A protein has these predicted regions:
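A general signal for intrinsically disordered, low-complexity N-terminal leader regions
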Residues: 5, 18-21, 45
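Small-residue helix-boundary/cleavage micro-motifs
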Residues: 20-23, 32-33, 38
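N-terminal basic, low-structured, amphipathic or hydrophobic segments
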Residues: 11, 15, 27-33, 41, ...
Length: 494
């Protein structure tokens, strides 16, 4: 009988159906499930990839074994299921232990992933979080927009912290560049919006993606060719300076920009190459890949609370277009969500609560990793998270910041919205309508006890266990991980 092992490796129990090359070693794991030892999985065995545990193999297999211990063998997309700042950096850091490659697929240095390890705090903006673990390769994909100056600064900061950066970092030659005029235009646009600001980080991300869509952007491949880069940059500086001067802003110096970016390009040259080919060859060798998302579902340019969004696709689909890896090579999607809800910047947040916000700020929590801005806080929003699960095809959820509710009693949970007297179970597309939605709450008993020392589910207070089960039920997705603190060790694997 044919079976699917380890979330995606297809083999046949019929010896005649197996390739003649190599041996097949089947073991029984600690969970009592049979699986193939990863060291013995030949390239020819990875013939059929399934995306979910519940799906049958395309070859028509009718039986399968699912090994939770080896779930990290799968190619995994990790996405934020809220408005960003869900604690993805910590979850990525935990998952990275069982993968070989970590890939960033979209966004720029407007995002910030915070990772705590052995008392040290690391904030990463462009480089994937896997850089903090030895033996992992980090890839910045074609969907990312890169400010070379900012990237070099991040590399220098990490090296000062004795983090090795060399052959473990690859940068796509197709990634677009963020240039000085992008930052200036971003700032000027935000200033002129007055009271109707989007809340941009003013890092030039939106204008850079605008040039990409208009097919006039500069890419890393241009930067690797000094003459080509200088020619293209000169034309763009002339174009943008007309716009900037019309807005009353200082023009960009072509000479300064050209010299600084070419110098940065030479320093980055050893890292730049064809990352699409690298990733496909890695998959052929059975390497495990984690696709690291930036921001969150409701900041997605298509599916977010437009126009209060970022300029890239932050949902699971963006991981494929931003890396060149086809959808059928993805085995699972993990959504990360806080035990409550937060948002930085403008835009609707239906479950926002000022009292909860003030309490969390008083505890030193909820300040943006990139800008340091105070985050707006609200109760857990099951309406939004259910919709995020639908859009991303989330297979399992990781809850973070459960310890943030240790002193809260009672706890509210938003189970639906009310708009013009009508109950809504999905968020409206229009930003104005979403802003006018009233949350419909249910109340859950708090636990009034610390959770940060819990290392397995049974060690959580009974009320905390009930709470996480409840939000799992509301979202319709199983929980795989609970974070009760910033350190790697402060994690409960379910």
């Amino acid at each position: 009988m044919n079976r699917v092992y380890s979330a995606g490796v297809w083999v046949s129990r019929n010896p005649g159906a197996l390739p003649a090359s190599g041996g097949l070693k089947i073991e029984r794991c600690a969970f009592g499930a049979e699986h193939i030892n990863a060291k013995f999985v030949a390239r020819s065995y990875r013939q059929h990839i399934i995306r979910r545990q519940s799906r049958l193999c395309p070859a028509g297999c009718i039986g399968k074994i699912f090994c939770p211990f080896l779930i990290a063998m799968a190619n995994t997309i990790l996405v934020g299921a809220q408005w960003g700042d869900e604690g993805k950096g910590k979850i990525i850091d935990v998952l990275t232990a069982k993968v070989d490659i970590v890939v960033r697929s979209q966004g720029g240095n407007n995002a910030g992933h915070t990772v705590f390890h052995r008392g040290a705090k690391y904030i990463l903006h462009l480089i994937p979080s896997g850089i903090l673990r030895r033996g992992k390769v980090c890839v910045i994909g074609n969907g990312v927009v890169i400010d070379p100056i900012a990237l070099l600064g991040e590399i220098d900061r990490l090296r000062k912290l004795r983090i090795t950066i060399g052959r473990n970092l690859l940068i796509s030659d197709c990634a677009h560049l963020v240039l000085p005029y992008h930052r200036l235009l971003d700032e000027q646009r935000e200033l002129r919006r007055g009271h109707v600001r989007i809340g941009t980080t003013k890092r030039g991300i939106g204008p850079a993606y605008g040039d990409k869509a208009a097919r006039t952007g500069l890419r890393m491949s241009d930067l690797m060719q000094p003459i080509v880069f200088s020619k293209k940059l000169h034309a763009k500086v002339i174009e943008y300076n007309r716009i900037l001067q019309a807005l009353g802003a200082k023009p960009v110096s072509f000479r300064e920009a050209n010299e600084s970016y070419l110098a940065a390009g030479e320093k980055l040259r050893p890292f730049v190459g064809n990352t699409v080919v690298y990733l496909h060859r890695a998959m052929e060798r059975g390497k495990r890949i984690l696709f690291e998302g930036a921001q969150g579902t409701f900041l997605d340019i298509d599916h977010g609370t437009y126009p209060y969004v970022t300029s890239s696709n932050t949902t699971a689909g963006g991981a494929c277009t931003g890396t060149g890896v086809p959808p059928h090579r993805i085995d699972r999607v993990v959504g990360v969500m806080k035990a409550y809800t937060t948002r930085v910047g403008e835009g609707a947040l239906p479950s926002e609560d000022m009292q909860l916000t003030q309490m969390l700020h008083s505890l030193g929590r909820e300040f943006g990793a990139t800008t340091g801005r105070k985050r707006r806080c609200g109760w857990f929003d099951a309406v939004a998270t259910r919709y995020a699960r639908m859009i991303n095809g989330i297979d399992e959820l990781a809850i973070t910041n459960l310890d943030g509710l240790d002193r809260v009693d009672p706890i509210r949970v938003c189970i639906a919205y009310r708009l013009n007297g009508k109950r809504l179970n999905v968020p409206p597309c229009d930003a104005g309508q979403l802003a006018n939605c009233e949350p419909i709450y249910t109340h859950v008993r708090g636990w009034n006890a610390p959770t940060h020392s819990a290392r397995n589910f049974s060690q959580l207070p009974a009320a905390a266990r009930k709470y996480v089960r409840y939000i799992s039920e509301l979202t319709g997705a199983k929980l795989s991980m609970i974070s009760v603190g910033p350190e790697r060790s402060e994690t409960i694997i379910l």
